[in-house]
Swiss-Prot record:
The keyword 4Fe-4S does not apply. GO terms for biological process: nucleotide-excision repair. Residues 734-755 have a biased composition (Basic and acidic residues). Residues 152-176, 302-321, 629-661, 722-758, 1075-1196 are annotated as: Disordered. Residues 1119-1130 have a biased composition (Low complexity). Its EC number is 3.1.-.-. Its cofactor is Mg(2+). This is DNA excision repair protein ERCC-5 homolog. Mg(2+) 1 binds at D30, D77, E822, E824. Residues 1-78 are annotated as: N-domain.
Length: 1196
């Protein structure tokens, strides 16, 4: 990894290089980073790891190096240092935690997205599609096109049509131009009421009319003279106003025509799916020619509108018609759905479950069929519940897939204002009258009493009720009209497809026609192989539904008595269990809706012969529906009086709780609440919301069926109890448990769980299958990506990989070494000892170990090979090895974690703010930060720079800076051996065998890669190339893009020069003092010897040349005089030569310091420095010459 962000900082100092110029050079290669890249990054097109990716990567890169005739030395990593192990462990732990959090977040987002999509799909409802139904065995998925598939050629017809359109457009424009010219010439010449104008396209008409409007608004007075009489001016204004009004009307009509033209396709599309009663109005919202927005309000299907407006219809059938049964229903469904899928299912006939799914998907077309049938009442569309919505219902219900013979149709309908739900038992009617009844023994029956509900006038008699739960006053009443508002369906809210109209079950008030009984039978088709046998019942079995009217404290009540007599059908006396529902039991509770699945007792939904009876409830008819009304007078006496028929009487389901929900009774259904209905399924021919379940009954003798009757002023809820007499020999578990039967409830829950698991895929629609497949595909893709990411993170370089790589290097004849510790440190020491010409690596740690030449991006196909030198880095950025180590402290590396939120720019600013050598800048920074944290609550120092104000917010560790990090970089454990390396020639045969065993390559493929490399190696080059004689073109150094970084580098380099100048100046001052003391000693020695020679006066420091002489006035004078012929020099040699060198250097440094104060520092200052020259050779020569010149000076 290296130092974070260091390559970004050093990129300005790198320059591109041609790999061909590296021929013959010895380069060290850090193979450890190759192995990590191969293990973590090498993937195939599907994202899976490639087998032996490390060997394949090494093979190709070796071929590239040998092709350029480069002599590589590979270096393997040894044992990781302690600091590196600690840092990598912490980093890996932090990365894993972040990865886990990211995966959890992605899962939450995915679940949220899927829930939203499911809700949207549920709200959108079913839409008719003209596409063929896909096969259930394989749902087609959109495949990616082949890269090499060419686009189809354009047809000549398309070209001709485009030319025709262009021609028509030109004609329109010419016509428009002519009309405009005529109008401008004479405004009255354009007649907007003419047929010629009306035949124009709406776009042209709109432009002409708008031009006319603008023209008449501005230039009317040019063509119409003002009235001379002031009294006629009002007429003039009124005339213009009328013309303007006509023009505006015409413009509005044209705009409507344009809107109709734009929205015609949308309107046609929706009309084909049912149509809209309201118009689609479009308006332009933005100034874009290609954009058009359509706002559709009040969407309502024409079928639904017709159903809402249609009056209640009487349910009357001729007795000669064949009644509908629950038997052979799926066979009828198969016949019904065959025309819909002949094109897609000719090869193999679909299974019954497939027919169910297809029938659910074509719900819209079935609604259309119901609309055309006269016997369907006005509110058939109540069941327009989307399959996705019903799927949510299925999750709380269970379905027995095997071994169950009785399937009961249940429809879930709830109220708009109430949220609780309830399961309901449905008896519906339809138009299929061709089905016959199949009993358990296989016999068939014709039109019989079990399917006919007859109402005779003689049955409308008063009867006495002796039940304890009934009120005292009882009167007989026919089933007249049951009406209930629709409920708000779950998951749909305001956008549900269920219409808001009230559902009605109408019995004609006229009961004189006894020969036309009412046939109420479910005719939802099912397959013949799933036949529903009728249930043998007891002769005395009776179901009574009591409907009290709670409008007052002592109000009237009604009850519906369902009696069943099985004597005429020849049934056995097997009992039927009871359904129990408590008033406070929650509706649609999955845990309470189960009964034992092992019992064979099922309830027949066929109420045979609904008839109002007088005294006896069992007289010749199998099943009778009695409607009686009981009231209790204030006196408490029991009075019987006949109830007059009221066609507006309403009966609804509910409980005696005022907050209970409404359960509607549809024209095709008599709905009875039942908590034991489970495993429902959407399957309908005339109602889309039918749910098919298996119902079994418990051992309880009482059935609580909840009704609700709305009063005149407010809605009230009452409790009803249906008493069913019969044998209680069944072992089913009742839904209403006592406190002493906890085990029965647990058994019920366990059996339901088993049913949920076994029948999860029992019935599913086409849309659900497609959605499920898409969701699974997305989930699979996500899991694959997650698995690949986890494998990439967990992948590590093993020792076996290193051994295999070394084996391949031996086959190619390439030398390699195993470093004691870090491979980068070993490569750096090879560079420092001139054993290599550089290192091929992408790890920036190598600079901290002292490398001088680095080649980066050598094997990157999208980038040039970059060459970096330590000298360029030092000259352009002012960074040396110690500063690079300090950057590692701040940015983070394999040895230290760094400071959070500190990048390479901020790190350079820190080094600029705190200059120094070694770790001194970091120590100063830590001390300043500690003081700043102590005074954090106080006002900040106004003298602090902007950088320091930002640095106050950083968080430093207590151990910062750790000296062990710098020691690890400055003194790494390396092999300092300087033994020579040797290279061999590749063994072709061994390499072929290696590639065949590891890569599975054939001999031909190996030769295609390897033979060009061997040919290049064998090429003998005796003549030198021209680039060996001429220096290559110099690459211009890239500038620093960041202004902050540029400022920090400039200031840091200036500070370094100032520090160096101060050090040199201090050294020069010390040297000058030593020189002065030495001169004084020499002068004293000369006087003591009695010489008369007089020394020239020393000039002061101010008299010297501002450029800085070498050692004073004597040397300055001698440099301006000619030398004597004998070449003798002055006695300057009496001064030590080292002193002369130091003073000459001090003079040069003084000139540089003076120049630096005038000019601004830049990165090029180091190149303009004056080369220091030693003055010693200038004064070497014979002593006689020097003495002669001195005597000449004295005489003068």
């Amino acid at each position: 990894m290296g130092v974070q962000g260091l390559w970004k900082l050093l990129e300005c100092s790198g320059r591109p290089i041609n790999p061909g110029t590296l021929e013959g050079k010895i380069l060290a290669v850090d193979i450890s980073i190759w192995l990590n890249q191969a293990v973590k990054g090498a993937r195939d097109r599907q994202g899976n790891a490639i087998q032996n990716a490390h060997l394949l990567t090494l093979f190709h890169r070796l071929c590239k190096l040998l092709f350029f005739r480069i002599r590589p030395i590979f270096v393997f990593d040894g044992e990781a240092p302690l600091l590196k192990r600690q840092t990598l462990a912490k980093r890996r732990q932090r990365t894993d935690k972040a990865s886990n959090d990211a995966r959890k977040t992605n899962e939450k987002l995915l679940r949220t997205f899927l829930k939203r999509q499911a809700i949207k799909a549920a709200l959108s409802g079913n839409k008719q599609s003209n596409e063929e139904l896909p096969s259930f065995s394989q749902v087609p998925r959109k495949e990616t096109e082949d890269l090499y598939i060419l686009p189809p050629l354009e047809d000549n017809e398309n070209n001709s049509s485009e030319e025709e359109e262009e021609r028509e457009w030109e004609e329109r424009m010419n016509q428009k131009q002519r009309l405009q010219e005529d109008f401008f010439a004479n405004p009255s010449s354009v007649d907007i009421e003419s047929e010629e104008f009306k035949s124009l396209p709406p776009e042209v008409k709109h432009e002409i009319l708008t031009d006319m409007k603008d023209f008449t608004k501005r230039r009317r007075t040019l063509f119409e003279a003002m009235p001379e009489d002031s009294s006629d001016f009002s007429q003039y204004q009124l005339k213009g106003l009328l013309k303007k009004n006509d023009l505006n009307k015409c413009i509005d009509n044209v705009r409507k025509e344009l809107n109709q033209q734009y929205s015609g396709e949308v309107q046609a599309q929706f009309e084909s799916e049912g149509g809209f009663l309201k118009e689609v109005e479009t308006r332009r919202l933005v100034s874009e020619d290609d954009s058009h927005y359509i706002l559709i309000k009040g969407i309502q299907s024409k079928q639904e509108e017709k159903k809402v407006d249609s009056p209640p219809q009487s349910i009357t059938f001729n007795s000669s018609q064949t009644p509908k049964t629950y038997l052979d229903l799926k066979l009828a469904s198969a016949h019904k759905t065959k025309p819909l899928q002949t094109s897609s299912a000719e090869a193999a006939p679909p299974s019954p479950r497939t027919l169910f799914a297809i029938q659910e998907a074509m719900a819209e077309s079935w609604d259309h069929e119901k609309h055309e049938k006269p016997s369907v009442s006005g509110c058939e569309a109540e069941g327009n519940v989307s399959p996705r919505t019903l799927q949510a219902i299925y999750q709380v219900l269970a379905e027995d897939e095997a071994g169950e013979s009785n399937k009961i149709k249940v429809v879930l309908q709830s109220d708009e204002e109430r949220k609780p739900k309830t399961k309901v038992l449905v008896i519906s009617s339809s138009d299929e009258e061709d089905d016959c009844l199949n009993y358990q023994d296989g016999t068939k029956t014709t039109l019989g009493a079990s399917l006919i509900k007859s109402i005779s006038p003689s049955s409308m008699q008063c009867q006495e009720s002796t039940a304890d739960s009934l009120p005292n006053y009882t009167r007989s009443k026919p089933v007249s009209q049951i009406e209930e508002p629709m409920a708000d369906h779950n998951l749909q809210g305001d956008n549900c497809n269920v219409p808001n109209a009230k559902d009605k079950l109408i019995v004609p008030p006229s009961l004189g026609n006894v020969d036309k009984p009412i046939i109420l039978s479910n005719t939802i088709p099912v397959n013949s192989e799933f036949r529903i046998p009728l249930l043998p019942v007891n002769m005395s079995m009776r179901e009574t539904v009591i409907i009290p009217n709670n409008t007052g404290s002592l109000g009237s009540s009604r009850y519906i008595s369902l009696e069943r007599d099985a004597t005429k059908q020849g049934f056995s006396d097997n009992p039927v269990g009871d359904l129990v529902r408590s008033p406070d039991e929650p509706a649609l509770n999955a845990s309470s809706a189960l009964s034992d699945r092992k019992t064979s007792a099922t309830q027949s939904l066929l109420c045979n012969n609904i008839e109002c009876t007088e005294q006896s409830m069992v007289q010749g008819c199998s099943n009778t529906l009695d409607v009686t009304q009981t009231t209790q007078p204030s006196g408490g006496s029991e009075v019987n009086k006949p109830a007059e028929y009221n066609p507006q009487d309403k009966k609804v389901f509910g409980s005696n709780d005022s907050s209970a929900m409404y359960v509607p009774m549809t024209p095709e259904s008599i709905i009875v609440s039942d908590e034991e209905f489970v495993n429902e399924k959407e399957d309908s021919d005339s109602d889309d919301s039918f749910i098919e379940v298996d119902s079994e009954f418990s051992t309880s003798n009482s059935q609580h069926v909840v009704f609700k009757e709305p009063g005149d002023t407010r809605e009230t809820a009452t409790n009803f109890q249906a008493v069913e007499e019969g044998n209680s020999g069944s072992q089913d578990i009742p839904l209403e448990h006592d406190s002493g039967e906890p085990h029965e409830q647990s058994n019920s829950e366990e059996s339901k769980d088993l049913d949920d698991v076994s029948n999860e895929w029992q019935d599913i629609s086409v849309e659900e299958l497609e959605s499920l497949e898409n969701n699974l595909y997305v989930q699979q893709t996500s899991l694959q990506a997650q698995q690949q990411q986890q494998e990439r993170i967990a992948a590590t370089v093993t020792g076996q990989m290193c051994l295999e790589s070394q084996e391949l290097l031996q086959l190619f004849g390439i030398p390699y070494i195993v470093a004691p510790m870090e491979a980068e440190a070993q490569c750096a020491i090879l560079d420092l000892t001139d054993q290599t010409s550089g290192t091929i690596t992408d790890d920036s740690d190598i600079w901290l170990f002292g490398a001088r030449h680095v080649y980066k991006n050598f094997f990157s196909q999208n980038k040039h090979v970059e060459y970096y030198q330590y000298a360029d880095i030092h000259n352009q950025l002012g960074l040396d090895r110690s500063k690079l180590i300090n950057l590692a402290y701040l940015l983070g590396s394999d040895y230290t974690e760094g400071i959070p939120t500190v990048g390479y720019v901020s790190a350079m600013e820190i080094l600029n703010e705190f200059p120094g050598q070694g770790l001194e800048p970091l120590v100063k920074f830590k001390e300043w930060w500690s003081e700043a944290q102590k005074d954090k609550k106080m006002r900040p120092n106004p003298n602090d720079t902007k950088v320091k104000k930002k640095l106050r917010l950083l968080d430093l560790q207590q151990s910062f800076p750790n000296p062990a990090v710098a020691s690890a970089y400055l003194k790494p454990v390396v092999d300092e051996s300087k033994s020579a390396f040797s290279w061999g020639r590749p063994d072709l045969e061994q390499i072929r065998e290696f590639c065949e065993s590891r890569f599975g390559w054939y001999r031909l493929k190996t030769d295609e890669v390897l033979l060009p490399v061997l040919k290049q190696l064998n090429a003998q080059q005796t003549q030198l190339r021209i680039d060996s004689f001429f220096r290559l073109e110099q690459h211009e150094a890239a500038g620093l893009k960041s202004q902050r970084l540029r400022r920090a580098v400039t200031c840091m380099k200036r500070k370094e020069r100032d520090v160096e100048a101060e050090e040199v100046e201090a050294a020069v001052a010390v040297m000058e003092r030593e020189c002065t003391n030495q001169r004084k000693g020499q002068k004293t020695n000369t006087k003591s010897q009695g010489t008369k020679r007089r020394k020239p006066t020393e000039c002061s420091q101010e008299d010297q040349d501002p450029g800085g002489g070498f050692i004073g006035i004597e040397l300055k004078t001698l440099s301006s005089k000619a030398y004597s012929s004998d070449g003798s020099s002055s006695d300057a040699e009496d001064l030590p030569s080292g002193l002369i060198d130091k003073q000459s250097q001090s003079g040069i440094v003084g000139r540089q310091k003076a120049s630096n104060k005038v000019e601004s520092s830049s990165s090029s200052d180091d190149e303009d420095r004056t080369v220091m020259v030693t003055a010693k050779p200038v004064f070497q020569g014979k002593k006689t010459k020097s003495k002669t010149m001195k005597e000449t000076v004295k005489r003068k």
